[in-house]
Every structure is written in structure tokens, then in C-alpha cells.
A protein has these predicted regions:
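Flexible hinge/capping segments at coil-to-helix
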Residues: 89-104, 118, 122
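Glycine-rich nucleotide phosphate-binding loop and flanking beta-alpha elements
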Residues: 65-70, 112, 171-172
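Short coil/turn connectors at secondary-structure junctions
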Residues: 72, 98-102, 161
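Short beta-strand-centered segments that line the small-molecule binding cleft or hinge
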Residues: 47-88
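Short secondary-structure boundary/capping segments
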Residues: 77-81, 95-96, 197-199
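Small-molecule-sensing regulatory modules
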Residues: 1-54, 113, 117-367
Length: 367
């Protein structure tokens, strides 16, 4: 590409999704080797029209903006490396050490259930609950999305709440002084065997959107194929779920080195995981080379006392089939756990007599 040629990358002010900050850093990094010009527009609708008009070449947006706007005639050229999709607790103490009955604000139903699983004693409130309790409904009504969370941090500092749970990008974007405690994907055995928090799908992605026909090869050095694969698999999972399940299902897909899985399996003495990675045609201890795709999915009942979860590790070339099988297994498990079991006359050798008795369902998704 000649020096006179440049690419105009469109963006919008922060939308609490991390996109604005990431594209700015990406332009700063890759702009050292080619002419990239960042242009900020006031609204996503304006940015989309500017892209269609040909005034810009690329528009950076979140997965939620892509699915929530009219993108006819546009396509996804690729994705930047995925940012951490986990949510965080903004509080003085880790979730394990919050006082009994501490007040924590959380708007997302999945995170509320996951937090109840960990700390059933906490008082979980919504922003509306806090506003009503503090007689501040009028104050909240006049705020936009950029003002809500700084106000919530003020309430925490004043002792009106003990903490609040937000996407990591919200904490980073507002430069909050409060300590950030990651609600992580891995079970933390150092913190009273803390349960993992599988996040709501599609967080942390930055899509580079272009007009159809844009030469993707011209920006290939900016793109992360593993992030694109994870995005497409998480999107497929979300689209296949019943709409009633989407707000209460956590799903996460990531490509990782096989050494990462081996280290995890060794630390947790996970013989099943070790066995699944062994090449049966070679001596034990010699594993198939290459990365793996890890897929996790879970949902909980409202009180957080019962969890339905599945996970699968596959090679990249088998990722779509792996996703289909993961969902099939998850939905079958969910069906069994949410169905009352009728009494049966069938007697299975080795099973206790109570096996034939009627039994209630293991979980209700709406109690």
C-alpha cells in the first residue's frame, strides 16, 4: 500500500463495553506501521451511516451493537483480540469477606444467581431498589448510562451500599477508585473453593465492521482468528437458546494452548481431562499437539442452590460439531433436571426401592 493511502477507523464515545479504549490502543499500535486515522462520531447510528456513505473504512463496535442495529450491506472483517469478558465486584473486600447481609447492587439476573450460589446471605439490589431506598428516583431518572455508575460508586463510598457488580469494561472506563475483584472463570481453590462465574455470552469482543467487499487482507495483522471463532460459536449458542433462557445462561468459548489444560488438569487431579487429551496411539504422557477450544455453559435456579452445567474441549476443526453436541447435552440435562419424575414399576437390579417412587424435579428456573 502506498504512503498516500490511509484507512479511516470510525468509533463512538465510550458505551461501557471497552470498544472505544481497545480500538484507540489498536490504532496506536498498528498505526506505527501504516496510516490509520481514528474518527469519533457521536452516535452508533451516525457511525453506521458514515460507513455506508464511504466516508470511513472500518467501524469498531461491540457484539451487542452488531446484533442490535441495522447492519444490512455490512460485514464483519474480523475481530481484535478478546478483552477479559468476566464481570467484577467493586468493593473494599473480596466477595468471600463481605460482611454478613452486605448490600450488593447487581442488574444482571445470571450474576445475581451466581452470587447467591456463593453468598446466599447477601442482599442483592437493583439500581431501582437503591434509588427507592435512598429516595433518589428523581436523581436516577435524570442520569444517562455514563452517569449511573459514578453515582453508584459515590453511594458505595458513603456506605449506602457495600459493592456493585459490573462488566470489567465499566470499571475500567470510569477509572473507579474502588478495588476490583474478578468473578473469574476458574474455580479458585485458594478462596474457600470459590465457584467459577461463567459470564453472559458475547462480552469482551471488538468487531471491525466494513462495507461488503472490503479487502480483509489489508488489516489482517490487526485481527485475531481465535477471537472470531469464539465470537461465532458463542453467537451460535445464544441463537439456539430459547429466549427465556438467554438472560440466565452463562456461556464462554476460548482457544487455549494444550499446555494450559494439562497444567489445570494436573493441579486439580482431573484424571478425566488428562485422559481426554491423551493420544491413544502413543505412550501415556504424550498428548496430541495443537490448541484446543474450551466451551462452557451453565444456568442456575433463582436461589443459586442448583446448577446445570456442561463443558467440552475439542480441536479447532471440530469446534462447530463440539458446540452442537455441547448444546444438545446441556438441553437434555436441563430437561431432566426441570421435569417431575413419575413413579415407575420398573425395578432395576442394584437400585434401591426408592428409585421407583415419584420424585419432584431437581430445579425450577423460575421459583
Amino acid at each position: 500500500m502506498e504512503k498516500s493511502e490511509y484507512l479511516v477507523i470510525l468509533t463512538t464515545p465510550s458505551r461501557n463495553d471497552g470498544v472505544r479504549l481497545q480500538i484507540e490502543r489498536a490504532v496506536g499500535t498498528h498505526g506505527k506501521h501504516r496510516d490509520l486515522r481514528l474518527k469519533q462520531l457521536p452516535h452508533m447510528e451516525t457511525a453506521l451511516q458514515t460507513l455506508r456513505d464511504g466516508t470511513g473504512d472500518i467501524l469498531a463496535m461491540s457484539a451487542f451493537d452488531w446484533h442490535g442495529n441495522d447492519v444490512d450491506g455490512l460485514s464483519i472483517a474480523g475481530l481484535l483480540p478478546r478483552k477479559e469478558p468476566t464481570w467484577v465486584l467493586v468493593a473494599d473486600d473480596k466477595p468471600e469477606y463481605l460482611e454478613q447481609g452486605a448490600r450488593v447492587v447487581c442488574e444482571h439476573e445470571l450474576l445475581r444467581r451466581q452470587m447467591r450460589r456463593m453468598r446466599p446471605d447477601l442482599v442483592l439490589e437493583t439500581i431501582e431498589d437503591v434509588a427507592a431506598r435512598l429516595k433518589a428516583k428523581g436523581t436516577i431518572a435524570d442520569m444517562d448510562d455514563e452517569e449511573i455508575w459514578p453515582w453508584m460508586e459515590e453511594q458505595r463510598l458513603e456506605g449506602n451500599i457495600d459493592g456493585f457488580i459490573v462488566p470489567r469494561a465499566v470499571h475500567a472506563g470510569h477509572r473507579m477508585k474502588g478495588r476490583r475483584h474478578t468473578l473469574g472463570l476458574q474455580r479458585d481453590q485458594t478462596e474457600n473453593n470459590r465457584e467459577r462465574f461463567i459470564p453472559p455470552p458475547l462480552h469482551g469482543f471488538t468487531l471491525l465492521v466494513t462495507r461488503q467487499g472490503f479487502p480483509k487482507a489489508s488489516i489482517v495483522e490487526m485481527l485475531d482468528p481465535s477471537a472470531e471463532l469464539a465470537y461465532r460459536l458463542e453467537t451460535a449458542i445464544l441463537e439456539r437458546l430459547d429466549p427465556s433462557l438467554r438472560p440466565i445462561v452463562g456461556a464462554y468459548v476460548e482457544q487455549r494452548k494444550i499446555s494450559t489444560f494439562l497444567k489445570k488438569a494436573t493441579q486439580e487431579n482431573d484424571e478425566a481431562l488428562l485422559t481426554s487429551l491423551v493420544d491413544p496411539n502413543k505412550k501415556r504422557g504424550v498428548f496430541k499437539s495443537g490448541p484446543r477450544i474450551e466451551m462452557l455453559i451453565e444456568t442456575l435456579n433463582p436461589s443459586g442452590t442448583v446448577t446445570a452445567a456442561c463443558e467440552r474441549i475439542v480441536q479447532p476443526e471440530n469446534s462447530h460439531l463440539g458446540m452442537v453436541n455441547l448444546l444438545k447435552e446441556f438441553m437434555e440435562l436441563l430437561s431432566v433436571m426441570t421435569t417431575d419424575h413419575e413413579a415407575t414399576k420398573r425395578n432395576i437390579i442394584g437400585m434401591p426401592a426408592s428409585f421407583m417412587d415419584a420424585s419432584p424435579r431437581l430445579m425450577d428456573l423460575d421459583e
